[in-house]
Regions:
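Residue position within the beta-strands of beta-propeller blades
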Residues: 49-52, 122-123, 194, 237-238, ...
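Residue-level signature of beta-propeller blades and closely related beta-rich strand-turn architectures
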Residues: 54, 126-128, 198, 241, ...
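Blade-level signature of beta-propeller repeat domains, shared across WD40, Kelch, NHL, RCC1
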Residues: 316-345
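A short loop-to-beta-strand structural motif that recurs across blades of beta-propeller domains
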Residues: 77-82, 138-141, 201-204, 242-245, ...
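Beta-propeller fold detector
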Residues: 28-29, 91-96, 149-158, 213-217, ...
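Short loop/turn segments that connect beta-strands within beta-propeller blades
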Residues: 85-89, 143-147, 206-210, 248-252, ...
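Beta-rich, blade/repeat-based domains predominating
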Residues: 33-45, 78, 99-119, 137, ...
Length: 345
C-alpha cells in the first residue's frame, strides 16, 4: 500500500509499458498557481474548469480515526474550483470546499466536476468524520450560482452501510478509508457514475434523489480503479495497477481490454483514439517529472506522445490538444505549485 495523495490504493508491481520511448516532452505550461489540481473539464460555456484539492486545515477527527498508514489527518476548507481564462488567469468559481491533509503531506479534497443540464456538480473525495469533517462527508455536491455548495449525495454513509465483498486492509500497513475515496465521475444517462478507489467500486448517483447504487464491486480483484472512459456502448475502467477493463453500459460482465501500463490516473477516448495518462514512468515509480501520455489506438498499437510530466492527474481534450494538470500531489502543505500544460496531438 503506497500513499499517492493518500489515494489509499493497493498497488502491486510496476510493469514495463509496451510503448515507444518518448523523446519529445511535447508540452507547454498554460496556467499556474493551482493547489493540488485534480481532474479538469471543459464546461458548457467552453471554458476549462479544474478541481483543486487544497491542503486541508487543522481540524482533527471527530470520530475514531481511520486505522491506516497515512495518519494523522487534518481537515479543512481549502479546496477550490477554478475557471482558466484564455490568458491563463485563474478565476475562482467556488472555494472553501472540504478536504484534508494526511501524515505524508498529501491531500484529498474536491477531485472532479461534471455538469447535468447546465448545473455543476463536484465530487468531494476527502470528507467525513475521520478527516475532521463530520458535516461534510465524501460525496457529491451541487455548486450553486453564488459559489456555495449543497450536498446531493452522501457517499460516506453509503460506504459505511454497504461493505464490499473484500474490505480494504486496516492497520499500520493498511490503506482502509471508512469514509470512502470517490475519485472521479462521469455523466451517463442523466446520472453521475462515480469511481470509488479505496473500496474498488463503481457507483451510480442520482443527483435528483441523492440515491447511491453500487454498480460494480471489484474488491476481490483489487485493481484500484481510478477513471472511466466511454466509446459508444462500451465503458473502460482504468486502474492504478496499469489495467484497463471494459464492460457495457448495463454494468454486466467485466473483461480485460489492455494491461501492463504504469500507474494510470486518467483516460480519454475519442473515435478510435485512446489517450492514457501515467503519473510516473514504469521503470521509475514515484519519480517526479516522469509522467507520460500514451496514445493507444484501438488496433492495439501504443505510442508515447508526451513525457516529463510532474505527477499529473487530470486530462481533458479540445480539438487537437490535450490539457493536463501537473504537480498535482507530492508537494506537502504548500499552495500554488500546480500547473496546467497543453499537449499538441
Amino acid at each position: 500500500m503506497i500513499p499517492l495523495l493518500c489515494f489509499t490504493l493497493a498497488f502491486g508491481a510496476i510493469l514495463q509499458a509496451a510503448a515507444q520511448e518518448c523523446t519529445d516532452p511535447n508540452w507547454e505550461v498554460i496556467a499556474a498557481g493551482l493547489t493540488n489540481p485534480r481532474n479538469l473539464h471543459f464546461g458548457p460555456d467552453g471554458s476549462l474548469y479544474v478541481a483543486e484539492a487544497g491542503i486541508g486545515g487543522d481540524l482533527e477527527p471527530t470520530c475514531e480515526p481511520a486505522d491506516n498508514m497515512f495518519q494523522p489527518y487534518r481537515g479543512g476548507y481549502s479546496g477550490r474550483i477554478s475557471r482558466v481564462l484564455p490568458d491563463g488567469t485563474l478565476q475562482t468559481v467556488a472555494d472553501g470546499l472540504p478536504g484534508f491533509l494526511d501524515g505524508f503531506g498529501d491531500s484529498l479534497g474536491v477531485s472532479d466536476i461534471a455538469w447535468i443540464e447546465g448545473t455543476m456538480y463536484a465530487l468531494i473525495e476527502g470528507g467525513g468524520c475521520t478527516r475532521g469533517l463530520p458535516d461534510d462527508p465524501a460525496g457529491v455536491v451541487r455548486i450553486n450560482p453564488d459559489g456555495s455548495y449543497s450536498y446531493v449525495a452522501d457517499i460516506t454513509a453509503f460506504i459505511r452501510a454497504n461493505p464490499v465483498a473484500s474490505e480494504p486492509l486496516c492497520g499500520p500497513f493498511g490503506d482502509c478509508e471508512p469514509d470512502g475515496v470517490p475519485h472521479s465521475m462521469m455523466v451517463h444517462g442523466g446520472k453521475l457514475v462515480v469511481v470509488e478507489t479505496n473500496h474498488n467500486s463503481v457507483l451510480e448517483i442520482d443527483p435528483a434523489s441523492g440515491s447511491v447504487t453500487r454498480m460494480l464491486d471489484l474488491s476481490v480483484q483489487d485493481p484500484a480503479p481510478i477513471i472511466l472512459g466511454r466509446k459508444g456502448n462500451d465503458l473502460f475502467l482504468a486502474g492504478f495497477d496499469g489495467l484497463i477493463q471494459m464492460f457495457g453500459t448495463s454494468f454486466g460482465s467485466v473483461s480485460t481490454f489492455d494491461q501492463d501500463y504504469s500507474a494510470i490516473v486518467n483516460l480519454h477516448i475519442r473515435g478510435n483514439d485512446m489517450y492514457v495518462l501515467e503519473t510516473f514512468a514504469p521503470e521509475m515509480p514515484w519519480t517526479p517529472d516522469t509522467g507520460r501520455v500514451i496514445h493507444r489506438s484501438f488496433d492495439g498499437s501504443r505510442n508515447a506522445i508526451a513525457c516529463g510530466l510532474n505527477f499529473p492527474i487530470g486530462m481533458a481534450r479540445r480539438g487537437n490538444e490535450l490539457f493536463v494538470s501537473v504537480t498535482s500531489y507530492g508537494q506537502g502543505p504548500v499552495t500554488g505549485l500546480g500547473q496546467i500544460v497543453r499537449v499538441r496531438l
